[in-house]
Amino acid sequence: MNFDAIVIGSGISGGWVAKELCARGLKTLLIERGRRVDHKVDYLDFATPWEVSNRDMVPEDEQAEHYAIQSTCSAFSAATRQWWVRDSEHPYVTPAERPFSWIRGYHLGGRSITWGRQTYRLSDYDFSANKLDGNGIDWPIRYADISPWYDRVESFAGISGASEGLEQLPDGQFLPPLPLNCLELAFKQKVEADHPTRRVTVGRCAHLTEPTPEHIALGRGPCQMRNVCERGCGYGAYFSSLSATLPAAQKTGNLTIVTDAIVERLDYDHAKRRVSGVRVIDARTRSGSSYQARVVFLCASTIASTQILLASRSEYFPTGLANRSDVVGRYLMDHVVGIGAAGTHPGFLDRYYYGRRPTGFYLPRYVNVTENDGDFVRGFGFQGYSGRSGWDRGADEVGVGAEFKQRLRTPGRWDMRLVGFGEMLPRADNRVTLHESRADKWGIPLVNIDCTHGENERRLAERANRDAAQMLAAAGFENIVPNGNISPPGQAVHEMGTARMGHDPATSVLNRYNQAHDVSNLFITDGSCMTSSGTVNPSLTYMALSARAANHAADLLASGDI
């Protein structure tokens, strides 16, 4: 079957590409390897506690057998189990001494259903970092190139947040921010008084606080502050492919969706320097088929897209499609997590907060920006969370009887956690390859993921732990516990970098518009395109790059240049 465009993957990147291409009048096929999911119908966000098995916990034996890796994600529960793959059915290879956690889900909408919804822009501190300190290659774009596209995707997605005027964290098109609670306001006041170059602000998140007519026309409503977001939101209050981009694409009449279709490889026509076809395997019947289009967007997620490229070998690309540079699969990055500190606060016992706010607070990067005293390059930011302990704290306390139960009716002490997100440097030996002898049940070679942190990440983590503990202590917190070892790569679920953008085809896979140097009608806009990781959550950047690349591709098609 022939289309104007094929988009592989329906998550945050694929959804945006499909929306933009369809809006430009292109007949677009969206290929999703997982099952079809119907927005609202297939969510458990309205399930009452007694309707969810085992008090929303997955039995330990089931976790160990089927979800050993997926269950390490904080969003994993009985009510969200449907959004994660069974590790037992979707294996991959990773060294025991250098483990990588590949956390994923196969279904329409992908991880746009379960993402953390934190939305921050990269700045020129990020886009110029590689060139300035010599780690990796230079980004082929700067902030000015992508800023209008940040504007575009923020307005459509709906981002709540507060403007702060920081060069390292550019402001955006914000809906009204959610409020900080009393403890966070006190912490903000103390941190900013002690450290004038540091800032505490509410987390910028993809939640509608005041829906616009465009949001309402798509059936989206305001956030109800229930904080069961990872189950899927029947109100459409947070941005996902299912609540926003795919409905918008479907309204054009130009979108065709195929689910349960696993991409086996991309065929290449050397004479035309083009992808000539997309071969897929039906996940249920294992029958094969092929689709053709004038342009192909690969948005299957970083590791899955890398797997497809490496599997698409040919006489002209013996090590994988678009891989003359030997870069495909290399420079895998994730954010440095498992860092920070936590503590309890003795005050504010007469204060509480309203609802279950779906975001925390944010303390943007300052080291090697406004405070140039790190013994490492790059930096980190903190995402913070605070609240009062509830009745369930009784499980860790000694007590029985009416008096004990009565005491638990009163909220407990305040606590706060500063969760660090640090930048990981791009290194060639952090790599995704195909296993030489093992394949999945559809005959596709398994990926082998070999990735570890280096000395720069370890020094960065030590500083983050120390700073977090010091800021909590200065603000009057007690029982402060700094974090220990860095979590294994993959735990941030921000994997990126394996088909990076760059100026030079000899050292990169993609040009400044996410177009493959070696294959004129192939574009890649998921996390694999990232040239460095920055310190902020990357999803908003994926959205902006996807919208930008899709419109550039549409322009090239209109002019006959591809």
PLM segments and residue spans:
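Glycine-rich loop(s) and the adjacent beta-strand/alpha-helix scaffold that form part
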Residues: 23, 27, 34-53, 235, ...
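FAD cofactor-binding and catalytic pocket of flavoenzymes
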Residues: 81-111, 115-116, 121, 139-140, ...
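N-terminal glycine-rich phosphate/pyrophosphate-binding loop and immediately adjacent elements
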Residues: 1-130, 135, 140-151, 304, ...
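Conserved redox-cofactor binding core of oxidoreductases
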Residues: 54-86, 90-101, 106-107, 115-121, ...
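A glycine-rich dinucleotide-binding beta-alpha-beta segment and adjacent secondary-structure elements
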Residues: 201-208, 226-229, 264-267, 411-424, ...
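Short, glycine/acidic-rich hinge or "gate" loops at secondary-structure transitions
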Residues: 39-41, 160-172, 478-486, 559-562
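A conserved FAD-binding loop/helix module that cradles the flavin
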Residues: 532-550
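Short, hydrophobic/aromatic-rich segments at coil-to-beta transitions
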Residues: 273-279, 415
